Amino acid sequence: MFKFAPYLLKTLWRHRSRTILTVSGSAVALFVFCFVGAVQRGMNDLETRQESKQSLVMFQANKFCPATSNLPQDYEEKIAKLPGVRDVVPIQVYTNNCRASLDVIVFYGVPPKKLQTARDFKLLSGSWAEFEQNQDAAVVGRAVAGRRGLKTGEKFSIGPLTVQIAGVYSSNDPAEENYIYSHLEFLQRGKNEDLVGTVTQHE
């Protein structure tokens, strides 16, 4: 292949104008492609930030680990009456480790009927009906499912919790794919203690 290099170089040198135009055109096309991609990504990031600004998360102050926060669940009604509040989602959080770890498992317990409106998830497998109808059901983020080898229909246990996987979801926010969402009441009763009436946070 290299024996043709001298001929190639001679051809490029003899037709310098055409070579310059070809290289310049390719460079401009690549620049436009990168510029449009950067603008599109910037607009998507801006839209995501604007959406996130519309949410406020409240949990108990002075807690090193948010999962240890305890707030009255009936705050939901009081918060819902505040001007500008469209909806309130009480959330119970359980994590197997509050310290830095490469494999922290985080459960979010939410009212099952509110999950689809509170989060923009797409089910890759399973069904929302299965999740909503069974109290021990959970939907698992794609990242967690990949790390743990979890599939729809299987059971997953960690600590005192055992859930039936009703589905695996994806999200536009990669961080969300590291969580497991279960029923609020299941998580309140699932740690050998009765936490009914209290939640970790309101969103």
Question: Language-model segments: which ranges?
Answer:
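N-terminal Sec/SRP start-transfer signal
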Residues: 1-32
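Amphipathic alpha-helical segments that mediate coupling or scaffolding at interfaces
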Residues: 11-12, 46, 50, 159
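Hydrophobic secondary-structure segments that place a key small or acidic residue at a functional site
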Residues: 91-92, 100-111, 122-197
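Short helix-loop capping/hinge motifs at secondary-structure junctions, enriched
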Residues: 113-118
